[in-house]
């Protein structure tokens, strides 16, 4: 069955094209710095937003019109979604997809029944993977939707829930390995608290670390060689989540001796909710060698929740890809579109239009960022700005030779301090030149 009959194969037609079903800036085979653009960007489709989201919000009923809606049996719906997914993957020519365990198969009455459902759908996906160019970027477990996780999963006050969550992640790791997933993600949507009045924060954090160590041990036991990733988010659905931002997660990993096993999956809209620029989170992760992958989306700056919009801001995508290029590119990670069409964009074709918009925006952003890095635009200015640390007293500070006594002596004998302008306006103007030069 063809699910998207009105959508042709999406091809690159260039920036002058008026075809809505064509890429304007993303030419997957364009060679930049010795490899195709598709290998630089490593695009991925998010199974949950694309195939399971129905448009429900706190104020209204589902709006999405999907070709598989006529099925009533949950397993029939799951099978139809797999068929539709690989049709979309093929028409977009996207190299990867990501999934939660509960995205691909429905939950049963018992854990055994749920695992049986998963096995059925995983076998179906494996058959498609044999002939598809699309592979699995990462898998994960949904430890937040079911009411059993009302108090958390690994941080639940109920040990029975901790055990169930462990069993669920065990299975999710197995199927991610079985499907050839290159990464495995942990996102703690319920790992946090609503009030400290009823919370043993120390025990919860210790238990979260115990849980993650168990995951590492089991992954090693089954031979899963994918990269473990943690996705920071400060709030929503929980008031205060323990994986607040990149720095919070980094401190947690360091404290519990997990930093050698984990990197971060940074999401743009989560950075917004934490009060950071997307680039800030990427920069922090990059300079600490923990940037693993990216959830590509954007938020609405006027709203205080996770809107998960398709990323269309070229300035944002440029600065994001600047950090990726400075890192040396992705290893096992990629750009996963953790984005959903708006509730009023309910037609099946909108799924393609959203991905095309995001893929074009990141392709354009990559090309601009590559020029910025190659031309050393910001590097030269930053090098000049901090040159005082390459000579004299600055060099002594950096080398560790200076101390408070020697610095006091220097300050007493150097009463005149001369600062120079930070030239922010100039640099922003130069960035605009690069953004709009083509």
Swiss-Prot record:
UniProt cross-references to PROSITE patterns, sorted A to Z: XYLOSE_ISOMERASE (PS51415)
Subcellular location: Cytoplasm
Active-site residue list: 100, 103
Domain of life (superkingdom): Bacteria
Residues annotated as binding Mg(2+) 1: 231, 267, 295, 338
Binding site for Mg(2+) 2: 267, 270, 306, 308
Protein name: Xylose isomerase
One term under GO cellular component: cytoplasm
Quaternary structure and interacting proteins, as annotated: Homotetramer.
EC number of the protein: 5.3.1.5
Note describing how the cofactor binds: Binds 2 magnesium ions per subunit.
Keyword list, A-Z: Carbohydrate metabolism, Cytoplasm, Isomerase, Magnesium, Metal-binding, Xylose metabolism
Record flagged with keyword Cytoplasm: yes
Protein family membership: Belongs to the xylose isomerase family.
HAMAP family linked to this entry: Xylose_isom_A (MF_00455)
GO biological process: D-xylose metabolic process
Enzyme class label: isomerase
Record-level Gene Ontology MF annotations: magnesium ion binding; xylose isomerase activity
Names of the cofactor(s): Mg(2+)
Record's catalysed reaction(s): alpha-D-xylose = alpha-D-xylulofuranose
InterPro entries (alphabetical): Xyl_isomerase-like_sf, Xyl_isomerase-like_TIM-brl, Xylose_isom_bac, Xylose_isomerase
